[in-house]
């Protein structure tokens, strides 16, 4: 089947004093060995830092594909070897070991590897910045470490303050949006973003899965951006990041352009305007 990964599937819990990292017995701690680095491409902005061994660092990376709170997160470390694809690990965002924390339960462990061959855990929709940030104001100021736990193991990335790195990330995102022909400041003032007319989970169907990839058990994770015009029609599909065979990219854009329909974005006074819709889809077999 196709599992559509959407940000509203994962519940957000407010920062609460539940120090599970401090109570854990089997903990691997990864200290930073490089500064944070922001990288700008023509499709996304990334924020990454090396941890562990300086000669061969593990990686904590965030990637953003549009304005707002959605982030893709990636962890690479052979300390994650205890994870299996069938697991449902928990991501823990915390303020030191004994301070407040909140958890994000993943529906599955999306595992892979980067060119360095280390175990890689993909988190398509990190809840570092929740959709309703009322109970977690300025999360990038508060959170100092990010961990993953399952099977009695905990791996902790001692990230430090994220305030300045994410300031740079937001500046990068503004510059990227300008290359799409849009004004980031005007987008912030929208009274409404494009609203899907039908559930996005229905835009891609089980019978869209490519036959060969299904037979081989191949899976994919695709981040896309649709430009949506004043009439609510998708006019362009851009693959912003893909951990997949190209066939998944092709099918994703073809089907979305054919099936996705929107109520258009509205400016401050309610006039329809062009904007974009950015999301991610996981192609998985079960």
Q: Over which residues does each language-model region extend?
A:
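Bacterial N-terminal signal peptides that target proteins for export
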Residues: 1-9
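Bacterial N-terminal signal peptides
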Residues: 9-17
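An ectodomain-focused feature that recognizes extracytoplasmic/extracellular
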Residues: 23-85
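Residue-level signal for well-ordered, solvent-exposed loop/turn and beta-edge residues enriched
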Residues: 37, 231-233, 238, 271
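Extended low-complexity, serine/threonine- and proline-enriched intrinsically disordered segments
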Residues: 74-110
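Internal interaction segment
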Residues: 101-203
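Short proline/glycine- and basic residue-enriched helix-capping loop/turn segments at helix->loop/beta transitions
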Residues: 188-227, 250-286
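A short acidic/small-residue loop/turn micro-motif
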Residues: 211, 241-247
């Amino acid at each position: 089947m196709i599992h559509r990964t959407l940000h509203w599937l994962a519940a957000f819990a407010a920062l609460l004093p539940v120090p599970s990292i401090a109570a854990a017995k089997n903990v691997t701690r990864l200290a930073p060995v490089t500064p944070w680095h922001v990288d700008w491409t023509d499709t996304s902005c990334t924020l990454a830092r090396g941890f562990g061994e300086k000669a061969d660092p593990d990686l904590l990376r965030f990637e953003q594909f549009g304005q707002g709170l959605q982030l893709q997160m990636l962890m690479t470390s052979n300390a994650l070897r205890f994870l299996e694809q069938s697991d449902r690990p928990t991501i823990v965002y915390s303020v030191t070991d004994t301070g407040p924390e909140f958890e994000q339960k993943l529906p599955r462990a999306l595992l892979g590897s980067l060119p360095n061959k280390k175990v890689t855990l993909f988190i398509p929709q990190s809840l570092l910045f929740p959709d309703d940030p009322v109970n977690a104001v300025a999360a990038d100021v508060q959170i100092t470490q990010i961990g993953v736990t399952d099977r009695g193991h905990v791996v902790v990335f001692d990230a430090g303050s994220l305030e300045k790195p994410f300031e740079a990330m937001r500046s990068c995102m503004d510059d990227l949006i300008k290359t799409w022909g849009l004004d980031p400041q005007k987008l912030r003032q929208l009274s409404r973003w494009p609203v899907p007319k039908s559930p996005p989970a229905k835009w891609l169907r089980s019978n869209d899965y490519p036959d060969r990839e299904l037979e081989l058990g191949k899976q994919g994770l695709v981040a896309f951006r649709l430009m949506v015009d004043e009439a609510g029609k998708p006019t362009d599909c851009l693959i912003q990041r893909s951990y997949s065979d190209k066939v998944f990219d092709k099918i994703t854009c073809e089907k979305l352009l054919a099936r996705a329909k929107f109520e258009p974005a509205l400016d401050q006074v309610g006039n329809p305007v062009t904007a974009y819709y950015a999301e991610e889809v996981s192609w998985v077999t079960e």
